Amino acid sequence: MPLFFFSRQMTRFAAFLVFSFFTTPAVYAEETGTSEKPFRWAFGAVQVENDLFANFANTDRHYTNGLQASLLSNPIALSGWLGEVATIRVPFGLADSAPAEHRIGLALSHSIFTPDDTSSTALLTNDRPYGAWAHITLTLQTLWKSRGNGTFQDQWKIDVGVVGPAAGGKFVQNNWHKLIGADEANGWSNQLHNEPGLNVTFERAWNSPDLAPSQLAGFEVNGIPYAVAALGNVQTYLGGGGIVRFGPDLPDDFGPTRINPGVGGSEAFIVSDAFNWYLFAGVEARVVGRDIFLDGNLFNDSHSVDKRHFVSDLRLGAVATWQNARLSFTHVYRTKEYSTQTKADQFGSLALGFAF
């Protein structure tokens, strides 16, 4: 009964999200013309993360591929329990602040994980399991305005999906390899078992006047710190970090998106007729309590490895915007995630966003 009730509520919420994209009153979508108000539009994005982008070789290892398509509504009025959730005052920094804007988001995502050796059909006990994760993400985003502390972006996210053969990792990876003429991964018979996945994540990013753009060699420099907490049978962790941006005219937004784990910014960006760009570098540290792709299934015995509880990501990237489009690329260096891992991982994240 509880599972049926939860599924019914999630179905209603998803229907509400889709309906809202097409029925948001015009009063919440002010005309922008050629101005640079960033948050009056609705936004969409498609994103690909792959180790090919970082290694420039036709190989697969560990987190090898991620796909995501997402939508973020224009500002809307929320009421009832959605409004209550969106305005929860999580501590730290919200003194003398008020919610200025609410958005809802919907994303479809797929991630694939493999061991280092994908040629073997045997169970590789010292290497990470094969696994895939297909899920829908429902997002409540709130911008808080504070006279003294700037702008805060809070995002509550619920991920609902499935890990295991039902997620289609073998089908996606091997059919793609057939298409491009690459070797198939042979060990998918050893993958994680089917398991429903549920994760709840809270993210906060700060755009503080204390970190407002300063000048360096004629360019602007600023920082955006953030924190994240995730709880679920797929991933449980606490994290924090930030990015430093460098460019001719830094936009008043929160940077490009990323596929979890790892805090991204937002699909929302500055819409302007002028071409703009910036470079960024960042770091994120996570304390990991659970990772199903290392710990194995929660409800069944499965292949697992001894995970590391402290993981860090280093990032370098670039963003370009023109009119209602944004293109970003992020190179991620991720420290070792389990005890028998031979070397750190690298992958690239390419995202194309658009405003409408």
Feature map (PLM): residue ranges:
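Transmembrane beta-barrel strands of outer-membrane/channel proteins
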Residues: 44-50, 104-112, 158-164, 204, ...
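Long, hydrophobic/aromatic-enriched structural stretches that serve as scaffold segments
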Residues: 87-172
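Outer membrane beta-barrel transmembrane domains
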Residues: 116-118, 243-356
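Short glycine/proline- and aromatic-enriched beta-strand/turn motifs that initiate or cap beta-hairpins
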Residues: 29-77, 108, 113-118, 288-294, ...
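Extracellular loop and loop/strand-boundary signature of outer-membrane beta-barrel proteins
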Residues: 54-55, 121-126, 184-190, 228, ...
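Short loop/turn motifs that connect adjacent beta-strands in outer-membrane beta-barrel proteins
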Residues: 30-41, 75-102, 144-155, 208-223, ...
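Residue-level signature of outer-membrane beta-barrel architecture
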Residues: 71-73, 110, 140-142, 204-208, ...
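Residues that define the transmembrane beta-barrel architecture of outer-membrane proteins
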Residues: 61-67, 130-134, 154, 194-200, ...
